[in-house]
Amino acid sequence: MACSIVQFCSFQDLQSARDFLFPHLREETPGALKRDPSKTSSWEDDSWGAWEETEPREPEEEGNTSKTQKNSWLQECVLSLSPTSDLMVIAREQKAAFLVRKWKHGDKGKEEMQFAVGWSGSVSAEEGEYVTSALCIPLASQKRSSTGRPDWTCIVVGFTSGYVRFYTEGVLLLAQLLNEDKVLQLKCRTYEIPRHPGVTEQNEELSILYPAAIVTIDGFSLFQSLRACRNQVAKAAASGNENIQPPPLAYKKWGLQDIDTIIDHASVGIMTLSPFDQMKTASNIGGFNAAIKNSPPAMSQYITVGSSPFTGFFYALEGSTQPLLSHVALAVASKLTSALFSAASGWLGWKSKHEEDTVQKQKPKMEPATPLAVRFGLPDSRRHGESICLSPCNTLAAVTDDFGRVILLDVARGIAIRMWKGYRDAQVGWIQIVEDLHERVPEKGGFSPFGNTQGPSRVAQFLVIYAPRRGILEVWNTQQGPRVGAFNVGKHCRLLYPGYKIMGLNNVTSQSWQPQTYQICLVDPVSASVKAVNVPFHLALSDKKSERAKDLHLVKKLSALLRAKSPRPDSFETEIKELILDIKYPATKKQALESILASDRLSFSCLRNVTQTLMDTLKNQELESVDEGLLQFCASKLKLLHLYESVSQLNTLDFHSDTPFSDNDLAVLLRLDDKELLKLRALLEKYKQENTKATVRFSEDADRVLPVKTFLEYLEYEKDALSIRKIGEEECVALGSFFFWKCLHGKSSTEEMCHSLESAGLSPQQLLSLLLSVWLSKEKDILDKPQSVCCLHTMLSLLSKMKVAIDETWDSQSVSPWWQQMRMACIQSENSGAALLSAHVGHSVAAQMSSGATDKKFSQMELDADAEALTDSWEALSLDTEYWKLLLRQLEDCLILQTLLHSKLSPPAAKAPSLQSEPLPRLSVKKLLEGGKGGIADSVAKWIFKQDLSPELLKCANKERDVENPDEPREDLLHLAYEQFPCSLELDVLHAHCCWEYVVQWNKDPEEARFLVRSIEHLKQILNPHVQNGIALMMWNTFLVKRFSAATYLMDKVGKSPKDRLCRRDVGMSDTALTSFLGSCLELLQTSLEADISRDEVQVPVLDTEDAWLSVEGPISIVELALEQKPIHYPLVEHHSVLCSILYASMRFSLKSVKPLALFDSKGKNAFFKDLTSIQLLPSGEMDPNFISVRQQFLLKVVSAAVQAQHSKDKDPSAEAANTHWKDLNWPGLAVDLAHHLQVSDDVIRRHYVGELYSHGADLLGEEAIFQVQDKEVLASQLLVLTGQRLAHALFHTQTKEGMELLARLPPTLCTWLKAMNPQDLQNTGVPIAATAKLVHKVMELLPEKHGQYSLALHLIDAVEAMATL
């Protein structure tokens, strides 16, 4: 109940705004930069704390000035905060930062408000102009649904050039030049409901102070103009048209005279003098000849501070009314018309951009100012005023000067009524507090309207003074009251007092909604926080006889007593009773009792005795003087304390249930046969094994007693009914454990506990909610103690028999809300084992009560022969029974699925990537019902991805067990899931979800190429071509085509296989991953082609759902989306497949001088990367021979590279091991297929393949490949050359004596031909001569006898045979 200062907002990154406005401060922080350069842009990284710790103690040391400058930077800025706390402006010179409000979750789970930089930049449009003042004005909404509430906030900025510009979040709305001098100050006044009928209603206005003039803009005109400009800016941004003329603006302009300098001003508003004051003023100025009118004139009052006079009072007549004095009227009558409301001229062009592009050279026309002389002032030639702050009710004003004084002015009388000294560079503001009628105490024997709770509320004003030199914030009671609060806040803060609220309200809209606006706040740059000052109303009433002050003293004394380190047990309780009984005010007494009950240092008996004593004292008083609210509060707390005592006693009693418990008893209790009970036990045992985790448990946690303080926080009495507050899940578990945990273990009497709770007034529904929260959260302990099921059955039966648990009018053909509450708790629980057990217990109790009710009903009737049949049919037709059966099936399915998802492979194959090590979320029936038809398969697919199971293993797990396959528990669980979900986990559906899951995870980390490879493997396992085609098409469009096109353009640009850096930059993966990616794309396109061929032969599958999950809702499944896909256009997919093969071959073999797109004409290029289901114009007819030649050269390169990679002797074993998935591809065969699509002769490719095989010494493979060649004569000529190269190498490079002799015996023709051969073209020169002889004979077979080289071949045979004998 004392004055306080509370933080209500913080800054997300204030240091970045400081660095933007003060770049030199950022450069002067070498210490912070050396510590961690990456953390210099965030105030959250302890940079402020580091500076505070290193602050020099002696002011003479170096660095103290630098630190002060870094912390006091806010004093040099223009600062403004919107009254609705949604926008803040920090400006300096030509720059400004607009900070917007954001909400984030704090450490305690509550939302915290923060200011973050929403826009920053330069706001100056003319050269050399600086920001001098700024305002954030919230504008009221005009919508019916939000009348009176803030719609948006306008930022008004004044400049040294005289311009006033209006912004909204960085967008310039309009700009106005009203005077050529610089803007000194901007102030705003919004509408306030008059407190008394005689008070003049003030209009809204924006006042702009210049060195010798003051301009006031009418609030209604400004409001309409800003709304129109904002709408036009939005239209201009949408249409691109910026040539829109802003609407006109009405204003008044007064030239202030007879004053030297003006620093600040206050616009008091319209005032009317009383007849006495009117005559007094006329007599003092005009003498006895002064004439006055019958009705006093209305005048606008302005107060300025500066020098000569120190404070000046100006009065401007409103409308055409006569001035107060005749000669004054003569002086201003000729000029009065110029100050009437007129349309503002000279609007500048505005734009919907952050900055203006150009500034118009021509200055707008200036309206002349109407002279306004100072009527009187406070003359003080040595004193210079610095600021003036008007009170909320316009009766007082606080003025600061250069002498360190704060002067309090009476605005109406124009006199100084109080002065404070010792406040140099002070910042002031006001707080207006309205009295709370509920805190009033009736006055004894008085007839004051403020002596009862029905009178009008009083209003108190407090002056807030911030002295930055001393770092202190003080709150003073006005006018002559004492200081009521003082706080040490630091020396670098800024005190913000806007003095206005929301613009655009009137006497009707201002009453529809009370805006949440602050009156005054303190911005602390050191702690990066915004704090509000709270002052209770009663501080305005404090005097020597104040009972309130005495009560506050007693409350402080009580707080100190509760915080005492070593309280005296003997007198502690007595002192507390005396203190609380001495307090007079009921509200303060209630506050004291709340602090006592919230203390965790007092024993339960002390709390009970203190509360009981206060209760007895109140009952002994007279009824008229007793506060009913306090009496009810004490009674409710006593009831809660008695309930706490009774529950604690029941939990401490030595109670043990001697009833034996067996499996047969459990089966009878749950109404299950032996087979069903065994199945339930087996499921729970598997679930328990898979969900076992190594956790540390403390014995005191289970038996920990709920503190009485926490107990009182959780419960409350409302209208004589005990209810549970809105608390979190953990709090519900704690409260439920306090009530039921001992009962569930058989250590406390269940009947007595239920009776105590029911007698206290807790409803059965709340007790059921607590019971289930405990049961479902303590799953591990419950599964270890099966006897707790019996205790739950007993507890649930007792709760169900309470009076308001089950409605007596409930019909079996309708759903019981009682049982529906229990079912909903089981549906939402993620602990499937505990939920399944509780559902069995609930089903059993519901059936028991239903049978009992049926027996009771039929016992009152005459039974006939069919009575038993009627009873059976009654139970069978119960709607709740059907819902229980459905829930049991769903929970059993969820339990099996949960067991599977938490099972782990042992041992782990290898270190799993981070994506595969992420834990899977726990399941609940609700999640499965909201997950759509594919939710179950999607969950299993995530588990398969996490375990990295092969598609073959999924197929094996779906088969029946046989002797050959070993029993593996993980496969057993998967097989059990298949049996439980025959529709949701159908193999095609599961493979489709696995395929999608792998490609989604690959997209998160493209470097994991094996994820995409595994995705394609699952895609190939899908049997239905409709599903296969749809999944492939979705994968291509969603994840692959963008990267595929990027890879194509990159390879075409560089003309070879790109390096790793380029691949990462353009495609987002390494060169190795890109190679694998292209191979996977090729397999996907080929799979799509195969699926399209068999589409017409297979029907579209019908997707079924298990009976228990027919009510599933949620997103459409992957398989359903796949079936909605259109059929592919086969030629277009084939066209992409050709391109993919080219790219894959180029990357696989690192081919150079290859531009993939150069192999296609314009039609072929235009068809790439289009929708695979669309019909595109593809190349047809004869191709240009130049294209064919380039294609043929590429295919020959591929064949050569493939043969070399396969048969080269200098292979890299590590690279070969890393690229094992590339060896399966038949590259020569693929080259032949490509030759068919590229219109290249496939026989040329086959002949080249045979030649490459023989060149590498693979003669056996070459002999097999010869059979596929069509033109064997040309092949024989090519092989003859290769034979000559082998012989030339053997004869000329060995140069043995026998070889030279043989060479001399050869025919001259053959010798000349061998010398012309180049053996360097051979890839393998170590081929045995016998293999070469065999090759010559093969050439002889292929060459016809009439061939020109036939005789040469005969000579070769002789030469080879001769060499074989050497």
Curated annotation (Swiss-Prot):
Acidic residues bias spans: 43-63
Residues carrying Phosphoserine: 38, 448, 914
Modified residue annotations for Phosphothreonine: 899
Pfam families xrefs: RAB3GAP2_C, RAB3GAP2_N
Keyword tRNA-binding in record: no
GO biological process: positive regulation of autophagosome assembly; positive regulation of protein lipidation; regulation of GTPase activity
Location of region: Disordered: 30-69
InterPro entries hit by this protein: Rab3GAP2 (IPR026059), RAB3GAP2_C (IPR029257), RAB3GAP_N (IPR032839)
Subcellular location(s) per record: Cytoplasm; Endoplasmic reticulum
GO cellular component, one term: endoplasmic reticulum
Keyword Ion transport in annotation: no
GO molecular function, one term: GTPase activator activity
Keywords: Cytoplasm, Endoplasmic reticulum, GTPase activation, Phosphoprotein
Functional note: Regulatory subunit of the Rab3 GTPase-activating (Rab3GAP) complex composed of RAB3GAP1 and RAB3GAP2, which has GTPase-activating protein (GAP) activity towards various Rab3 subfamily members (RAB3A, RAB3B, RAB3C and RAB3D), RAB5A and RAB43, and guanine nucleotide exchange factor (GEF) activity towards RAB18. As part of the Rab3GAP complex, acts as a GAP for Rab3 proteins by converting active RAB3-GTP to the inactive form RAB3-GDP. Rab3 proteins are involved in regulated exocytosis of neurotransmitters and hormones.
Subunit and interaction comment: The Rab3 GTPase-activating complex is a heterodimer composed of Rab3gap1 and Rab3gap2. The Rab3 GTPase-activating complex interacts with DMXL2. Interacts with LMAN1.
Family from the record: Belongs to the Rab3-GAP regulatory subunit family.
The protein, known as: Rab3 GTPase-activating protein non-catalytic subunit
Organism of this sequence: Mus musculus (Mouse)
